[in-house]
Amino acid sequence: MAWTKYQLFLAGLMLVTGSINTLSAKWADNFMAEGCGGSKEHSFQHPFLQAVGMFLGEFSCLAAFYLLRCRAAGQSDSSVDPQQPFNPLLFLPPALCDMTGTSLMYVALNMTSASSFQMLRGAVIIFTGLFSVAFLGRRLVLSQWLGILATIAGLVVVGLADLLSKHDSQHKLSEVITGDLLIIMAQIIVAIQMVLEEKFVYKHNVHPLRAVGTEGLFGFVILSLLLVPMYYIPAGSFSGNPRGTLEDALDAFCQVGQQPLIAVALLGNISSIAFFNFAGISVTKELSATTRMVLDSLRTVVIWALSLALGWEAFHALQILGFLILLIGTALYNGLHRPLLGRLSRGRPLAEESEQERLLGGTRTPINDAS
């Protein structure tokens, strides 16, 4: 069945906005500008402020939900039910996980390459699978266990590529290792978030845009308030601002004033996460969760290719091998081999229900992509 123009538009929107989301965050990190009080030129390293911006983008999904609800007010068959019972506090625990995981990933993005950042996020499969067995009572089939093992192997190869790559003065080997480990740690938290959402949220049949928007609201408010104590908490060498504190939002705004292109990068990050979530949800609804997963894998290729073209990182053949192994692991875990085996076995009907399964991130993406 050929795709309609609308489906092609959604697929393109998801691919483009998902790529912009990671690349714009890395672009902002690469800028150098003076800070407040005439401080010397330094890198724009404000991961927690960037996380606040990401949650602002997710929060905008709530506005999109209410617009859809107003438009569908007179439609009895609409999926946006005005009378749907809803307790926003259900989203507080997942939002706290989202806030922690997102902040860790933005910190890690300052330390490692955009392509490694995107590839290592595939580790979420490992922890989601293990946690779903432990806390949701789910039984994984052989192909899912093989997918987890392949994902572990892929992560090792990608990490090895980072170790063997040439490192400039901006990204020392110790920083790259720390950044990669932070990304893995963040995926543990993201996996906890997904398990919490499945156990306590999905059974209430909350509209995905409302779910994303509500978590964005909690994350935006809580992390914005935390910026105040972060301004005073010393962080030593871990800090990227002149004052040596955990976060210096005032320094960030001064840098934006000195270099307006930083604002362009931040706006790109904020707007892209909103459109990416909308496009991802729509792709799952209009096409399938499998299609969404394939597009997310293509996004990694786009990010890697553009990072090479822009000179942000050096080419390393091991990254290709690592990405292919990660792709195989993701495909095995999510059952993409079943349609292929169905076609190979003559006359055997394809299992269409596998297309409709909610895969990892099937209803939302936690960082930049997600998630």
Swiss-Prot record:
UniProt keyword list: Glycoprotein, Lysosome, Membrane, Mitochondrion, Phosphoprotein, Signal, Transmembrane, Transmembrane helix, Transport
Glycosylated residues (UniProt): 110
Domain of life from the UniProt record: Eukaryota
Domain EamA: 104-160
GO BP field: negative regulation of mitochondrial outer membrane permeabilization involved in apoptotic signaling pathway; positive regulation of cell population proliferation
SUPFAM superfamilies referenced in this protein's UniProt entry, alphabetically: Multidrug resistance efflux transporter EmrE
Cited function: Involved in the maintenance of mitochondrial membrane potential in pancreatic ductal adenocarcinoma (PDAC) cells. Promotes pancreatic ductal adenocarcinoma (PDAC) cell growth. May play a role as a nucleotide-sugar transporter.
PANTHER family assigned: PTHR13146, SOLUTE CARRIER FAMILY 35 MEMBER F6
Protein name: Solute carrier family 35 member F6
Organism expressing this protein natively: Homo sapiens
UniProt gene name: SLC35F6
